[in-house]
Amino acid sequence: MIELIPAIDIIDGKCVRLSQGDYGSKKVYNENPVEVAKEFEANGIRRLHVVDLDGAASHHVVNYRTLDLISSRTSLIIDFGGGLKSDEDLIIAFENGAQMVTGGSIAVRNPDLFCRWIDRYGSGKIILGADVKDRRIAVNGWKDESTCELFPFLKDYTQKGIEKVICTDISCDGMLAGPSLDLYKEILAEHPTLYLIASGGVSSIADIEALHEAGVPAVIFGKALYEGRITLKELQAFL
């Protein structure tokens, strides 16, 4: 069964969503992310994707207190991303309750450091973030496009020990227009043992069913849940 991973994106300690990574499109859904996390947990959700959007823009972890509150008041398994640029950032994330961390920009800008994290903490704790725009990896809170192409990027890091990848098609994220099924099928055809976590575009329970049928191991979703297009009750079929 596909693993369900709701997302809580944080700006100024509040639960927000963006469209295509545009900070100007910010919409606040709840002033208290802990309330959101507790509601997820009460409905059978076991894992959470927490993104520090302030951190992603500032190049260092910012909303670690919110991470600590969520982790201390729920039993959710949390993977945390946004602003992880140094050993200190990683320690802050783990000390404040993250069980896993996701590195995207760092894997492009400082691959030596990212590989040290893989070696030190193991592939169970370090997730590769592959945020894609026109098949190239985007960095710095999606504001910049790198020269890294997706498939060589994935091949390189799977050879270095990465086993889990969150792949977000930026053109889909927050648009409620459906996920990039063909892209995910292509990735799994090339990397059949990869724990691929699809992210971006989920608009309905049918999208989750389609990802499940395509063999995608896990899915991150947010706006569809916050906008009421998917209900927590509907998700019970996958739990």
Curated annotation (Swiss-Prot):
Pathway: Amino-acid biosynthesis; L-histidine biosynthesis; L-histidine from 5-phospho-alpha-D-ribose 1-diphosphate: step 4/9. It catalyses: 1-(5-phospho-beta-D-ribosyl)-5-[(5-phospho-beta-D-ribosylamino)methylideneamino]imidazole-4-carboxamide = 5-[(5-phospho-1-deoxy-D-ribulos-1-ylimino)methylamino]-1-(5-phospho-beta-D-ribosyl)imidazole-4-carboxamide. The keyword Cell wall biogenesis/degradation does not apply. GO terms for cellular component: cytoplasm. InterPro entries: Aldolase_TIM, His_biosynth, HisA_bact_arch, Isoase_HisA-like, Isoase_HisA-like_bact, RibuloseP-bd_barrel. GO terms for biological process: L-histidine biosynthetic process; L-tryptophan biosynthetic process. Its main location: cytoplasm. Its EC number is 5.3.1.16. It is found in: Cytoplasm. The keyword Isomerase applies. The active site is at residues 9, 131. Pfam families: His_biosynth. One of its GO terms (molecular function) is 1-(5-phosphoribosyl)-5-[(5-phosphoribosylamino)methylideneamino]imidazole-4-carboxamide isomerase activity. Keywords: Amino-acid biosynthesis, Cytoplasm, Histidine biosynthesis, Isomerase. Belongs to the HisA/HisF family. This is 1-(5-phosphoribosyl)-5-[(5-phosphoribosylamino)methylideneamino] imidazole-4-carboxamide isomerase. The lineage of its organism: Bacteria, Pseudomonadati, Bacteroidota, Bacteroidia, Bacteroidales. The gene is hisA.
